[in-house]
Amino acid sequence: AEYVVESTGVFTTMEKAGAHLKGGAKRVIISAPSADAPMFVMGVNHEKYDKSLKIVSNALCTTNCLAPLAKVIHDNFGIVEGLMTTVHAITATQKTVDGPFGKLWRDGRGAAQNIIPASTGAAKAVGKVIPELNGKLTGMAFHVPTPNVSVVDLTCRLEKPAKYDDIKRVVKAAADGPLKGILGYTEDQVVSCDFNGDSHSSTFDAGAGIALNDHFVKLVSWYDNEFGYSNRVV
């Protein structure tokens, strides 16, 4: 095979993923964060890709949702600091019923019966693809009993004052322009099922966000964490 998508979640380092190269593959895409492989998010830093790189990471589905939105907001208004929460659909690593999960007791609780707080490196990883935001974002996840589609809540402090309508305008311009196909924009009264099979990395929900004032806002963006992410891998 010329290209191998490493999606087991096991071979996520350069050394381990390199086994595919030894097996005859020409390039490897890791569908997860990596400790040492270069990380790329389409629409954010993909232009920095160098053809000499044989192994790359496509980051997390949540990073692919957050990073394009964070880039647009930071480029236009400046993000001083921010906290992200993802309300995330069930994943393959969760338990069907309560069971052992090392020291992470909550992660071992039944996926279909609980809302489960969990850690995620998705927000911090944005700093790897947008260096100016390194150390300015962190976040957490709530795993919920739905089969697919997740949603990011980015609450951030802005450097430049902005009305919520200003934010909607610049996000829509990006969605219709340079980030078309990656960042979406909707003013419809949507819910999670509406995004099953949506190929965007991130769809900004204009009607769901709120502003406390011109410097402090909560922004909401949806993503099909399976199909949408798979489109970016391809």
UniProtKB/Swiss-Prot annotation:
GO biological process annotation, one example: positive regulation of type I interferon production
Modified residues (S-nitrosocysteine): 61
Active-site residues, Swiss-Prot/TrEMBL: 61
InterPro entries found in the cross-reference section: GlycerAld/Erythrose_P_DH (IPR020831), GlycerAld_3-P_DH_cat (IPR020829), GlycerAld_3-P_DH_NAD(P)-bd (IPR020828), NAD(P)-bd_dom_sf (IPR036291)
UniProt similarity note: Belongs to the glyceraldehyde-3-phosphate dehydrogenase family.
Pfam families in the record: Gp_dh_C
Site (described: Activates thiol group during catalysis): 88
E.C. code: 1.2.1.12, 2.6.99.-
Keyword field contains NAD: yes
Subcellular location: Cytoplasm, Cytosol; Cytoplasm, Cytoskeleton; Nucleus
Binding of D-glyceraldehyde 3-phosphate, residues: 60-62, 91, 120-121
Function: Has both glyceraldehyde-3-phosphate dehydrogenase and nitrosylase activities, thereby playing a role in glycolysis and nuclear functions, respectively. Glyceraldehyde-3-phosphate dehydrogenase is a key enzyme in glycolysis that catalyzes the first step of the pathway by converting D-glyceraldehyde 3-phosphate (G3P) into 3-phospho-D-glyceroyl phosphate. Participates in nuclear events including transcription, RNA transport, DNA replication and apoptosis.
Assigned keywords, A-Z: Apoptosis, Cytoplasm, Cytoskeleton, Glycolysis, NAD, Nucleus, Oxidoreductase, S-nitrosylation, Transferase
Pathway: Carbohydrate degradation; glycolysis; pyruvate from D-glyceraldehyde 3-phosphate: step 1/5
Catalytic activity, reaction form: D-glyceraldehyde 3-phosphate + phosphate + NAD(+) = (2R)-3-phospho-glyceroyl phosphate + NADH + H(+); S-nitroso-L-cysteinyl-[GAPDH] + L-cysteinyl-[protein] = L-cysteinyl-[GAPDH] + S-nitroso-L-cysteinyl-[protein]
Protein name, entry field: Glyceraldehyde-3-phosphate dehydrogenase
TM ranges: none
Residues that hold NAD(+) according to the record: 31, 225
Quaternary data: Homotetramer.
Record-level Gene Ontology MF annotations: glyceraldehyde-3-phosphate dehydrogenase (NAD+) (phosphorylating) activity; microtubule binding; NAD binding; peptidyl-cysteine S-nitrosylase activity
SUPFAM superfamilies given in the database record: Glyceraldehyde-3-phosphate dehydrogenase-like, C-terminal domain, NAD(P)-binding Rossmann-fold domains
Gene Ontology, cellular component aspect: cytoplasm; cytosol; microtubule cytoskeleton; nucleus
Source species, domain of life: Eukaryota
Post-translational modifications: S-nitrosylation of Cys-61 leads to translocation to the nucleus.
Primary location: cytoplasm
